[in-house]
Amino acid sequence: MKLLHLFIAFLIFNFSFLIPLKVLPQQTNKYFKVEVQKDVFIETWFLLYLPDGYDTINQSWPLVLFLHGSGERGNILEMVKKNGPPKLAEFGKSFPFILVSPQCPEDQRWSTDVLDMLLDEMAARYRVDSSRIYVTGLSMGGQGTWDLAIAYPDRFAAIAPICGKVDPGDAAKLKDIPIWVFHGAKDDIVPPEMSENMVNALKAMGSDVKFTLYPDAGHDSWTETYENPEFWEWLLEQHR
């Protein structure tokens, strides 16, 4: 009987390699080039993640634009997978939305105009639900999140800036947008007062902005945020 059990186990182990495994959605490298003036072009590489079922389910999908921090700038697109949603997707997490993760060029900051044109390109090429477009980012990308929403407040259903610099003088442009702000209380790179001052300015204008201040977190206030299912549930519940 023991030999029979061993033989069955041997068959299961070996023939299991013949059973096709479910293929997880993958992030693909994409290239975006736009003419901003006559003979003046802007080029951007980005990671594109399409949700499981995109090719088989004929529907429009939410889109999340993710903006990385300063350490991932350059021309090595794999660096964008270092943190945030691209990192989670790389390790097999399945998202129910289109994820667009561009790379900022070396020694530059996020360009709101280029990002807006990138979103136009995504809406033209893919089945994007225009009422459910979101932006989130960390550190320099948190600042980029604020800046992009300030420049194009009618574009987004919600925004989620994480430890990003921002001028509270721009609060009036954002008071009607659902916002969830995150920061570490021990952040010694971007002081938490940056977020606190903006949150207070928004609340003074009647905004129902949400604010999470992690008491023991330093600059990395994004890992806990992006790994929290409640964050994604809240984000995807928002509609424009």
What is each stretch, according to the model?
Residues 1-27:
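Bacterial Sec-dependent N-terminal signal peptides
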Residues 18-61, 136-138, 143, 148, ...:
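A domain-start/cap signature at the N-terminus of enzymes
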Residues 52-59, 107-140, 153:
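Gly/Ser-rich "nucleophile elbow"/oxyanion-hole loop immediately N-terminal to the catalytic nucleophile
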Residues 63, 67-118:
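Active-site machinery of serine-nucleophile hydrolases
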Residues 135-137, 162, 182:
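Short beta-strand immediately N-terminal to the catalytic nucleophile in serine-hydrolase-like folds
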Residues 155-165:
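A conserved short beta-strand
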Residues 178-182, 186-240:
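C-terminal catalytic histidine-bearing segment of alpha/beta-hydrolase fold enzymes
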